[in-house]
């Protein structure tokens, strides 16, 4: 009986196992659907699927639970908020330093990325040595770190004195520095029509609807050139020709010359407005020489006759050579009575001794 019972039990168990097999067969298409989509996955055993009906959902929530875990790791744990402290030191080049808390006197690491409100005039984020700041304390990898660093009551930090400053006029630097106040409409009405440089403002504003700078530049450029160098450009733009003004020194020199040399009165000087102009040197009129005396005129005639008719006068255009030695004067010296003897004539006193010598012989 036991064998029969076993056989029966075995017979009964076989149909039950066969019945269990078709019952386990329907869950097979569910795991095969990913394989049909193209992912090469092996079918899971039926015993696992049948024995743990909740096992289908177990692998699904696993990645969902891992995402919050990663976000929690990214967010650091906040230890304290709105803590006041004094900057112990901060290196601008390396971008980190330490802040000493005022409550616990503990040094907290601070990085330049933790500065929330930087000085707008500074290029790099930084905090100055000895500056009082407000920050949050979070737990970092190696200890306490500062986050959301600002000035007291949330104002921007002062920054380190070693951090580079921004340029004050980056856009339109040259135009804003020497430009007038921004009253473009008034300037266009006042100076647009009477511009001395011939500039005409645009007629229709619709043509430049989107270009704001193109409307600004033509309107206030002409006043710049007039206001930049007012004393120089006013004299140059209206009248660039040289004017003639009477010079006081020349007037005095003219009066003196009229008294002495006969220069006409009212001598004028040509004055230029250009301050760098230097007038050229001009030789004045030749001075009239006084007429020579009668005796001097006769002497000149005698000298010309002695030198010869072809030779030019010795006084005008004569220049002694470099290696010239003075020769003794010819025997045409002036006599005591004031008359000259020519070089060809022999003196009257010399022949007398000659006749005496011949008679003695």
UniProtKB/Swiss-Prot annotation:
The modification Omega-N-methylarginine is found at residues 243, 315. The keyword Hydrolase does not apply. GO terms for biological process: animal organ regeneration; apoptotic process; cellular hyperosmotic response; cellular response to tumor necrosis factor; ectopic germ cell programmed cell death; fertilization; in utero embryonic development; male gonad development. Residues 85-149 form the CSD domain. Residues 1-23, 33-71 have a biased composition (Low complexity). It is found in: Cytoplasm; Nucleus. Residues 214-230, 316-329 have a biased composition (Basic residues). Keywords: Acetylation, Cytoplasm, DNA-binding, Methylation, Nucleus, Phosphoprotein, Repressor, Transcription, Transcription regulation. Transmembrane segments: none annotated. The modification N-acetylserine is found at residue 2. The keyword Nucleus applies. Found in a mRNP complex with YBX2. Interacts with RRP1B. Binds to the GM-CSF promoter. Seems to act as a repressor. Also binds to full-length mRNA and to short RNA sequences containing the consensus site 5'-UCCAUCA-3'. May have a role in translation repression. This is Y-box-binding protein 3. The gene is Ybx3.
């Amino acid at each position: 009986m036991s064998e029969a019972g076993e056989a029966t039990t075995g017979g009964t168990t076989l149909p039950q196992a066969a019945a269990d097999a078709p019952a386990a067969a329907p869950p097979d298409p569910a795991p095969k659907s990913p394989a049909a989509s193209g992912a090469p996955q092996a079918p899971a055993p039926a015993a696992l699927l049948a024995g743990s009906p909740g096992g289908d959902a177990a692998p699904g929530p696993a990645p969902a639970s891992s995402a919050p875990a990663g976000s929690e790791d990214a967010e650091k744990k906040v230890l304290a908020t709105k803590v006041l402290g004094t900057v112990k030191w901060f290196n601008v080049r390396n971008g980190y330093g330490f802040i000493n808390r005022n409550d616990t006197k503990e040094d907290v690491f601070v990085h330049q990325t933790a500065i929330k409100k930087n000085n707008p005039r500074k290029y790099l984020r930084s905090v100055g040595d000895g500056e009082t700041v407000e920050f949050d304390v979070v737990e970092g990898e190696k200890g306490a770190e500062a986050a959301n660093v600002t000035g007291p009551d949330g104002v921007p930090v002062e920054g380190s004195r070693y951090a580079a400053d921004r340029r004050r006029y980056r856009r339109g630097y040259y135009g804003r520095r020497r430009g007038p106040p921004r009253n473009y409409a008034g300037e266009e009405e006042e100076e647009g029509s009477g511009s001395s440089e011939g500039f005409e403002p645009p007629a229709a504003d619709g043509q430049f609807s989107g270009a704001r700078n193109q409307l600004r530049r033509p309107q206030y450029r002409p006043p710049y050139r007039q206001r930049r160098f007012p004393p120089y450009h006013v004299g140059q733009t209206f009248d660039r020709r040289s004017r003639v003004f009477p010079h006081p020194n020349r007037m005095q020199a003219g009066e003196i010359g009229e008294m002495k040399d006969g220069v006409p009165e009212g001598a004028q000087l040509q004055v230029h407005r250009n301050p760098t102009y230097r007038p050229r040197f001009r030789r004045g009129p030749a001075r009239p020489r006084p007429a020579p005396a009668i005796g001097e005129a006769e002497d000149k005639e005698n000298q010309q006759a002695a030198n010869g008719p072809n030779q030019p006068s010795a006084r005008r255009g004569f220049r002694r050579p470099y290696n010239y030695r003075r020769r003794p004067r010819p025997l045409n010296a002036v006599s005591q009575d004031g008359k000259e003897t020519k070089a060809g004539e022999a003196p009257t006193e010399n022949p007398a001794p000659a006749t005496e010598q011949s008679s003695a012989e």
